[in-house]
Amino acid sequence: VYIEYDPYNPKSFYIILDGLSKEACMTLATTNWGSSSTGLVGVLVGETSRFMDDSYNYLVKNGTEGIIGGASHKGYYANAPYLPLSPAKVLDACGEPYNSYVPGFSIKFTK
């Protein structure tokens, strides 16, 4: 668990949780954490840059394991305005076919 500050918004920060079990990942990802400006940002799978692109309000993921929401030209994961995540997307992010990766989870808070 660690904290990362938003490079685009000094009043925002992220709490990153690594190494979650599939069950914990799914529970957190289906929780309604609040409005589009506060709460869950996305589920990270595998090795990620953890770079937060605030212009899209997406969690940006490097690699090509798949895309959940967002534009198809980049590896975005779930965007904040459409939360909580649907169970199908959560299962995809937290479980198969990514079970060989270590799931991570990010929660964004805005002061």
Named regions from a protein language model:
Residues 1-110:
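Intrinsically disordered, low-complexity regions enriched in Pro/Ser/Thr/Gly and acidic residues
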